[in-house]
């Protein structure tokens, strides 16, 4: 095949848009004339084109756009499919990736600018985020705002601060502001969490205090109920410990308080105004009903107490043999009726319950086995005084202790 003449090649180069001088063309033609071996005319033209681009690169001069456009057109996929699929010129490592080789229709005239447009002529003037198409303002425009969470905003702001460093100063300032906003959000969340923890701790302490108060109130109420039940159960079996009467939770040791004064007035009437009214009771208990290991002193133990706590003397008319005998009421009545007892008997037997004063001798004393001092001016106990624990105690003791003297004498 005959090669094209130099004039033809020169005219082709000039027609192709290459601005070259006559001297350069003549020199290139001389070079091509010497090296005309196995190259085709198309290959020679491509070689000349690349030689001109090389000269601009060596001279540190900007390459004109007219020299680059033919290369981009020549790399179209239908013509050179192997280049567009990752060939030598198609790789982005050689610097051709920014021109989107093989896609002339999708070329971006301003690669670093945000691509948000109104579909016609307007385009966003901000710089796009690195490796993104849009700026920070338009990067989330397509998402549903109603489904965005508060945590997502802070996390996205924290992520946006990292690429904003490589942007111009305006973008960098925006990134710093968004980062400070995210830090402030984290601080407010931490403060809110601490406040919630303190409120929970205060609520728990208040609930514990309220529970302890309710528990103490219930314990006090149960103590009073247990004491009244113990008094009623022990009065039925005639075995009442002296300590339970002396140390009652409601001060039932016959102290001069209004509650006990009401009990005395209900028992003996309003006409008697004695402050030291006492009653001595000695209740015998059958020994056969008690267990064998039951102490004799506990079997003969009788309740004792006085208004001042120091007057624990027993009545002079009660014989010591009555308390120590084990023959029952008839044995006590027929064995010994003496009215005096020695000091050993006084120290051996515990004091008896004194509800009437020792000096009160206006009413007759009955020599009965039970030793009940009955007054002639006895009045009935109204129901209002029995409602209290002290009133019920006085009523139970008198009703269980009063015995008709004539019935005892007939025995």
UniProtKB/Swiss-Prot annotation:
A motif (Bipartite nuclear localization signal) lies at residues 113-123, 141-148. Transcription activator that plays a regulatory role in gibberellin-induced stem elongation. The gene is GRF7. This is Growth-regulating factor 7. PANTHER family: GROWTH-REGULATING FACTOR 5, GROWTH-REGULATING FACTOR 7. One of its GO terms (cellular component) is nucleus. Pfam families: QLQ (PF08880), WRC (PF08879). The keyword Cell division does not apply.
């Amino acid at each position: 095949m005959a090669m094209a003449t130099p004039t033809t090649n020169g005219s082709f180069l000039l027609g192709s848009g290459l601005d070259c001088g006559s001297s350069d063309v003549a020199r290139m033609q001389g070079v091509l004339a010497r090296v005309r071996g196995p190259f085709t005319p198309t290959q020679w033209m491509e070689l000349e084109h690349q030689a001109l681009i090389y000269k601009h690169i060596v001279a540190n001069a900007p390459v004109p756009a007219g020299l680059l456009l033919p290369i981009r057109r020549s790399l179209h996929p239908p013509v050179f499919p192997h280049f567009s699929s990752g060939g030598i010129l198609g790789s982005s490592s050689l610097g051709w990736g920014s021109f989107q080789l093989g896609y002339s229709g999708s070329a971006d005239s301003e690669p670093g600018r945000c691509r948000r447009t109104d579909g016609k002529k307007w385009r966003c003037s901000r710089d796009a985020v690195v490796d993104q198409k849009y700026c920070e303002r338009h990067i989330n425009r397509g998402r549903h705002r109603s489904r965005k969470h508060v945590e997502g905003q802070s996390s996205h702001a924290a992520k946006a601060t990292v690429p904003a460093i490589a942007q111009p100063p305006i973008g960098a300032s925006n990134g710093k502001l968004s980062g400070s906003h995210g830090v402030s959000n984290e601080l407010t969340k931490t403060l809110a969490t601490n406040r919630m923890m303190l409120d929970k701790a205060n609520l728990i302490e208040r609930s514990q205090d309220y529970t302890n108060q309710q528990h103490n109130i219930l314990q006090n109420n149960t103590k009073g109920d247990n004491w009244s039940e113990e008094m009623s159960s022990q009065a039925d079996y005639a075995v009442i410990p002296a300590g339970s009467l002396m140390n009652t939770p409601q001060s039932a040791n016959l102290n001069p308080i209004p509650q006990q004064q009401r009990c005395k007035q209900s028992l003996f009437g309003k006409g008697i105004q004695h402050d030291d009214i006492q009653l001595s009771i000695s209740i015998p208990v059958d020994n056969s009903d008690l267990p064998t290991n039951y102490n004799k002193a506990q079997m003969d133990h009788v309740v004792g107490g006085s208004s001042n706590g120091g007057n624990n003397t027993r009545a002079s008319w009660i014989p010591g043999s009555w308390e120590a005998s084990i023959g029952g009421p008839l044995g006590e009545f027929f064995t010994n009726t003496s009215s005096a007892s020695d000091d050993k008997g006084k120290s051996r037997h515990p004091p008896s319950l004194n509800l009437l004063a020792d000096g009160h001798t206006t009413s007759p004393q009955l020599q009965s086995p039970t030793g009940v001092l009955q007054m002639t001016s006895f009045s009935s106990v109204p129901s209002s005084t029995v409602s209290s624990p002290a009133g019920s105690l006085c009523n139970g003791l008198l009703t269980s202790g009063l015995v008709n003297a004539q019935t005892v004498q007939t025995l």
